[in-house]
Regions:
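A sequence-level detector of short linear motifs
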Residues: 25, 52-53
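Cyclic-nucleotide recognition modules
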Residues: 54-107
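Polybasic "coupling" helices that flank or enter modular domains
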Residues: 108-113
């Protein structure tokens, strides 16, 4: 387990599990959370039902829709039995505000692109 995963796991975030082939969210749904993959794999699926990417342990997804209150432009499905950590918008922004100043600058720059 990576140091990042250990830190995130110990942060008190709620965990949620999905069985293989379960939909996490569908295109055009309103976002509820950003998700951190604790174990398993998640497929990102286009509007045309093409798998455009597979995310693995330690990766984050759903953050853009969640942070900017935009409907999901893709769907997310558990490719394997998967455990996710739920990251609420207020928790994410709180972590950004308490981050190192250089990291905050990087996050702000990336969010503008």
């Amino acid at each position: 387990m990576s140091d990042i995963t250990k830190n995130i796991t110990n942060s008190g975030l709620e965990q949620i599990s999905f069985k293989q082939n379960s939909m996490i969210y569908k295109v055009n749904e309103k976002p509820k959370f950003a998700y951190y993959i604790y174990t398993g794999e998640v497929e990102i699926i286009s509007k045309n039902d093409y798998v455009i990417g597979t995310l693995k342990e330690g990766e984050l997804f759903g953050e853009i829709s969640s942070l900017f209150n935009k409907e999901h432009s893709v769907s997310a499905k558990a490719a394997t039995d998967t455990r996710l950590l739920i990251i609420e918008k207020k928790v994410f922004f709180n972590k950004v505000e308490n981050a190192d100043p250089i990291l905050k600058a990087v996050i702000r720059t990336l969010s503008l692109r």
